[in-house]
From Swiss-Prot:
PANTHER family, sorted: TRANSALDOLASE
Catalytic activity, reaction form: D-sedoheptulose 7-phosphate + D-glyceraldehyde 3-phosphate = D-erythrose 4-phosphate + beta-D-fructose 6-phosphate
Subcellular location: Cytoplasm
Designated name of the protein: Probable transaldolase
Any GO BP: pentose-phosphate shunt
The keyword Cytoplasm appears for this protein: yes
EC number: 2.2.1.2
Keyword Cytoplasm (UniProt): yes
A Pfam family hit: TAL_FSA
Species annotation: Herpetosiphon aurantiacus (strain ATCC 23779 / DSM 785 / 114-95)
GO molecular function: aldehyde-lyase activity; transaldolase activity
Amino acid sequence: MKIFLDTADVEEIRQGVAMGVVDGVTTNPSLAAKAGRNFRDVVLEIVEICPGPVSAETVALQADEIVREGRILAKWAPNIVVKVPLMAEGLKAVKQLTSEGIKTNVTLIFSASQALLAAKAGATFVSPFLGRLDDIGQDGMILIRDIVQIFKNYNIQTEVLAASIRHPVHVLQSALAGSHVATMPFKVLQQLVKHPLTDKGIETFLVDWQQVPDAATVFAE
């Protein structure tokens, strides 16, 4: 499963990419506002740091305007993926953008039927939102499994991108459910790395190492 960072914080992306495990980045208008910088400048910096897919979202509500905005975004860098909300006008736009060779990520998906429609329109990625479903008492992982199964049934090439991830369990469950991608906040990526027994083991090894006779010189050059 690929790991994307869901952030517009350039420093977080830099740190994540340096770890060697980040395959892409997703942004949205809310994350852009939180960054507090010119959106174009932020995206151009992100695509320099991360060579993988970088989702940048349109904000128009009519198909022709979504397409216009998508074309502008796609010109910024070859790894830009145009992010479009799931709605009738959005599907029209995705169809057109796909016909022009522009990759798309259909977002704000909360049902398997929505994901199927997005895939039919030609979406490169579909983004079902887990955390927001959990917030209203629904099981987002059932949605992931349903979408993955439908796509397998019909050999649909659209990738399932699990979004609205709140904690490491969401990541693990997404992987078990067959999601192609999980996009997460940087803090969740950090939580995936940490385990108290790992920390304790490192501490013990370092203490024991001091008892090795040549510990102070073995790695000297």
